[in-house]
Amino acid sequence: MSKFFIDRPIFAWVIALVIMLAGGLSILSLPVNQYPAIAPPAIAVQVSYPGASAETVQDTVVQVIEQQMNGIDNLRYISSESNSDGSMTITVTFEQGTDPDIAQVQVQNKLQLATPLLPQEVQRQGIRVTKAVKNFLMVVGVVSTDGSMTKEDLSNYIVSNIQDPLSRTKGVGDFQVFGSQYSMRIWLDPAKLNSYQLTPGDVSSAIQAQNVQISSGQLGGLPAVKGQQLNATIIGKTRLQTAEQFENILLKVNPDGSQVRLKDVADVGLGGQDYSINAQFNGSPASGIAIKLATGANALDTAKAIRQTIANLEPFMPQGMKVVYPYDTTPVVSASIHEVVKTLGEAILLVFLVMYLFLQNFRATLIPTIAVPVVLLGTFGVLAAFGFSINTLTMFGMVLAIGLLVDDAIVVVENVERVMAEEGLSPREAARKSMGQIQGALVGIAMVLSAVFLPMAFFGGSTGVIYRQFSITIVSAMALSVIVALILTPALCATMLKPIEKGDHGEHKGGFFGWFNRMFLSTTHGYERGVASILKHRAPYLLIYVVIVAGMIWMFTRIPTAFLPDEDQGVLFAQVQTPPGSSAERTQVVVDSMREYLLEKESSSVSSVFTVTGFNFAGRGQSSGMAFIMLKPWEERPGGENSVFELAKRAQMHFFSFKDAMVFAFAPPSVLELGNATGFDLFLQDQAGVGHEVLLQARNKFLMLAAQNPALQRVRPNGMSDEPQYKLEIDDEKASALGVSLADINSTVSIAWGSSYVNDFIDRGRVKRVYLQGRPDARMNPDDLSKWYVRNDKGEMVPFNAFATGKWEYGSPKLERYNGVPAMEILGEPAPGLSSGDAMAAVEEIVKQLPKGVGYSWTGLSYEERLSGSQAPALYALSLLVVFLCLAALYESWSIPFSVMLVVPLGVIGALLATSMRGLSNDVFFQVGLLTTIGLSAKNAILIVEFAKELHEQGKGIVEAAIEACRMRLRPIVMTSLAFILGVVPLAISTGAGSGSQHAIGTGVIGGMVTATVLAIFWVPLFYVAVSTLFKDEASKQQASVEKGQ
């Protein structure tokens, strides 16, 4: 095939240009992401049950829905949380690869079976089913720069004017508003109600009767009488729109004709629909909307669309209102992709310099360099065909592929020049002869490297998604590289290279290149003598090899494990939890102190702080608080001390001084869709029905043991501690004797102490809600219970304390379930210097000490880590097996592949040493780097074994053939290995966004390639001679036995 294109170079150029054109067009359509869709798809079901406790929500809503979710296809796990504000979320997580649209339809179908079984109030509130990931993509905030708007005004504007356009934006899955829109708030005065002998239920009924929209029909509507000339719509009573209209609602007409209106018993006015959340931006009143990404959506495109939507709305915003972005996870996407592209450019430059050093000819160096854009652009075309995106994983694959793809072209060019120098042939004739020599080696290398990476594409789960990105990228690049090496490179050699005089190996050149050539020639002679010595004394070196293999196995058992390396995402979280039963005012004091520290003491790194009270990732309530901390761009905070991890450590040390609150500062995980924090994530589960109290005791024991374990830090419950609750007990017999109905009692309690949604009203053209509730000063203490009255069947007003009492007890404001059983979520991090795998092992030891009946399950990132850890050995074994079979097919021998395969531990030991010395972990990126090392180690061995086998077949002895092959292939092996190592160096020394992943993959590959090159060039001939001799002796014995039998 190569001869055809050597004679038709333009044909070869046309093929290359078509490949480049296809790839270039593909780049324009490929989406850009930090990572592919690693997180499994999840469907969230959200329900509200106003006034209900967490326990009530769990018993009457959560369990009813969970029981109907059985039988859903591809279900991985199901989790739920119920809060004391009546809210509830069930998250149904599916196996990786499940179509999220199909998953949502299945969940909705199952939900239809559960809906009739839910309380009427829940059905009335509605049930939301969304395709959204767990974490927030970004927060859009609004502040009043001139102080003319309150937080209620800002919240109302977001809900009324921003929420709907954003929810319609492509890629938005769900949202949460930190605040609420206006509602018509009716604050009841119990004393005035009693004086007029009215109850909250009377008020609710009057509002429902008089705040209505009536469909009144038409005048002259069809069918009409003959001759009718008029047709007009009748406008009947409409919904009320102003506070004054509500104030005039008639409640009662006394016998003397006097009237009691709503304003006589209540304060009426616009107020917030919900008062549980208070947001601030850098200390100023604010509101915000947190946006979650739809499952499978592109984060970068969605964020751009959101910003464009906001930009379209800004001209219509009130004067003094300013939009801010206090939390955004997408800058790291652009920055990390930019860093990898920069690394790609640096790698290409370094590879070019290495090639020029060895080839010492600009034309010869240019030929492999031309292969780089052809292969890289062609690889983008393949990525588009497979539906992939441009992300850090595919770009890492490109960086690794640069060293691999120039290898093939270098081998071709170097061999053509060697043939010209040794035999004095013209470039065209040398190219023809050279391709006849190395064509088999090129195909063999491509097969082996493809065999290393191809099995990765068939693994499942989130780890399989990561493996697949590398696999398809590198295998595509390798395939295109061989095509270019067989088609374009020989054609270029034939047309671009200048003839070389016979016997000219460059040692007579002057200057630096001449010195380098003489030094390398001298090194080659020394190398030949070294190989001859090793082949003469094989036993000691085989023993050394056994020691290396033993050391490799020992290091594999000692190196810490992880799923993915932690990354500086440019954002930080701080979570506040004040003592159970704390008021919002008390929590706000702690949040203010936290914000002041961050803005004053960490101003060099912190850009803004958006705080929220009433909410955090652990739950909702007045004792909860949260801070979204946006850091300055990476280039404005250089140095390790300004990284998000060091900032979190300093902040945590300061927050430990807070005596009246628990405050945790933590960075988000490397894959945001898999959780909200770095470290480990698990659920303690009540597997035997031991009850809430035993489970709570088990959790507390776990936290105590974890605090004493040196392998763990920042271990905390991702929930809320039991808090004081006032249990109202109704004496049914007394109530019946007094003529009071239980329905009236329940209605009064719900309205007065809770918040009752009555119906809707129209505010500036938008439908909003009407809420009925007792005045704040009539529901602050248990004694206020006596202020409220219920009317009995005789029309008399009976105080609550006549039939009701109360007592204090403890209860949970948040209840969790995992896979259908009560559970409590726990988060934590490994101690400095340890990996998440070490921390998870420590956790598993602690769980063994918990009470019987309490189990555990990993979730989120930890679930994926356990899954990836179990897959890694199978991945290595399968890759090695496929490599062996490819080599056996290539050499038509079962023995020769062993001499190639035995070199693998020499590369692996270097990767393990480099990774351990740098304090890194055995994570997914390390595993990919290790497979790359395995492939390149085998490639170097193939270059020697291929030539040794040919020389042996030409009649030379095994030892002589091995030494001659080593001499001939030393220069290309060193050149290609050095080119690859230097091409990966930018990954290992990178800084800024995405540097954690780059270090993880670059460090192992460099270490592995150094040892694979330095050691393998001596051990490969030893393996070839030892294996060939062994199998030859065995074959001779078998032949002799056969002949003897005859």
UniProtKB/Swiss-Prot annotation:
Keyword tags: Antibiotic resistance, Cell inner membrane, Cell membrane, Membrane, Transmembrane, Transmembrane helix, Transport
Stated induction or repression of this protein's expression: By growth under severe iron limitation.
Membrane topology summary: Multi-pass membrane protein
Annotated transmembrane regions: 10-28, 340-359, 366-385, 392-413, 442-460, 474-496, 539-557, 872-891, 898-917, 924-945, 973-991, 1005-1027
Pfam families xref list: ACR_tran
Subcellular location: Cell inner membrane
Regulation affecting activity: Export of antibiotics and solvents is dramatically decreased in the presence of the protonophore carbonyl cyanide m-chlorophenylhydrazone (CCCP), therefore may be driven by a proton gradient. Antibiotic efflux is inhibited by pyridopyrimidine derivatives, such as ABI-PP, acting by binding to a hydrophobic pocket in MexB.
Periplasmic compartment segments: 29-339, 386-391, 461-473, 558-871, 918-923, 992-1004
Entry superkingdom: Bacteria
Main location: membrane
One Gene Ontology term from the biological process aspect of the record: response to antibiotic
Disruption phenotype: Disruption of MexA, MexB and OprM significantly reduces active efflux of N-(3-oxododecanoyl) homoserine lactone/3-oxo-C12-HSL/PAI-1, but not N-butyryl homoserine lactone/C4-HSL/PAI-2.
S-S pairs: none
GO molecular-function terms, A-Z: efflux transmembrane transporter activity; xenobiotic transmembrane transporter activity
Database matches in InterPro entries: AcrB_DN_DC_subdom, Acrflvin-R, MdtF-like
Spans within the Cytoplasmic topological domain: 1-9, 360-365, 414-441, 497-538, 892-897, 946-972, 1028-1046
Cellular component terms (Gene Ontology): efflux pump complex; plasma membrane
Keyword ATP-binding carried by entry: no
Further information: Pyridopyrimidine derivatives, such as ABI-PP, are not exported by the MexAB-OprM efflux pump, bind tightly to a MexB hydrophobic pocket and so potentiate the activities of antibiotics such as erythromycin.
PANTHER family hit by this protein: MULTIDRUG EFFLUX PUMP SUBUNIT ACRB-RELATED, PTHR32063
Purpose: The inner membrane transporter component of the MexAB-OprM efflux system that confers multidrug resistance. Functions as the major efflux pump for n-hexane and p-xylene efflux. Has been shown in one study to be involved in the active efflux of the autoinducer N-(3-oxododecanoyl) homoserine lactone, thereby playing an indirect role in quorum-sensing; but has been shown in another study not to be involved in efflux of this autoinducer. Over-expression of the pump increases antibiotic and solvent efflux capacities. Implicated in the secretion of the siderophore pyoverdine.
Subunit structure: Component of the MexAB-OprM multidrug efflux complex, composed of six MexA subunits forming a hexameric tube, binding to a MexB trimer, which interact with the trimeric OprM outer membrane channel protein. OprM is thought to not directly contact MexB; instead, MexA joins MexB and OprM by forming a funnel-like hexamer anchored to the inner membrane. MexA may initially form a hexameric ring complex with MexB prior to OprM, then OprM undergoes a conformational change as it contacts MexA, allowing the periplasmic gate to open.
Similarity remark: Belongs to the resistance-nodulation-cell division (RND) (TC 2.A.6) family.
NCBIfam families referenced in this protein's UniProt entry, alphabetically: 2A0602, RND_permease_1
Protein name: Multidrug resistance protein MexB
Organism: Pseudomonas aeruginosa (strain ATCC 15692 / DSM 22644 / CIP 104116 / JCM 14847 / LMG 12228 / 1C / PRS 101 / PAO1)
